[in-house]
Amino acid sequence: VIFGCVDQVGAQSGNIARNAVLSSSFPESVPGTSVDRQCGSSQQAIHFAIQAVMSGTQDIVIGGGVEVMSMVPIGAAVKDGFDAGHGLPFDSEGMKQRYPGIFFSQFTGAELVADKWNLTREDLDQFAFESHQKAANATESKFFDREILPVSGKNAEGVEDMVMADEGIRFDASLDKLAGLKTVVEGGV
């Protein structure tokens, strides 16, 4: 089990991947490793998992992530930091001088990229729509079958269930539905 997790503090500290193994029904002998690579931690964990299988080192590897970069430090005693005068992450004098008036988050970064490359809301909706279409077509054509290990468990209602597909793909995505989604910030893309 390889999980990405930026700034491991609070509930996600102490090697979250190992804790996930110990919290599961896996044998204690299953290793768990956490990767901290800032915004790319979860993606890196998945790459490491793929490489382990491709190299023949491992037969089955679970790769994933638990980070929410915009909320770092998750679980930290933020109030204590405020009381000590530390403020928010990225709240240094150098950052304030370099980027006056900007509050950093993933959403701010996305808006800056969209602005730099003149991407409109419509451009991004079209990209998202096509991405879901491609993923849905690949799923229906069974392209992902060799990459997904079916996992059994209980769903939210407590009924036994088998997860055999990526649940993030929206098979019913449409441009109208995407256009109806609110932006994270007023006037954003």
Regions inferred by a protein language model and the residue ranges of each:
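Flexible glycine/proline-enriched surface loops and loop-helix/loop-strand junctions
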Residues: 93-94, 115, 186-189
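Membrane-embedded alpha-helical segments and adjacent helix-loop junctions characteristic
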Residues: 1-3
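Flexible glycine-/small-residue-enriched beta->alpha junction loops
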Residues: 60-113
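Short glycine-/small-residue-rich flexible loop motifs, especially phosphate/cofactor-binding loops
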Residues: 18, 111, 136
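Conserved catalytic cysteine-centered active-site region
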Residues: 5-59, 100-108, 172-189
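N-terminal extracellular/periplasmic Venus flytrap/periplasmic-binding protein-like
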Residues: 123-189
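Short glycine-/acidic-enriched loop or helix-start segments at secondary-structure transitions
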Residues: 12-13, 71-74, 155
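Active-site-proximal alpha-helical scaffold in enzymes
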Residues: 37-67, 114-143
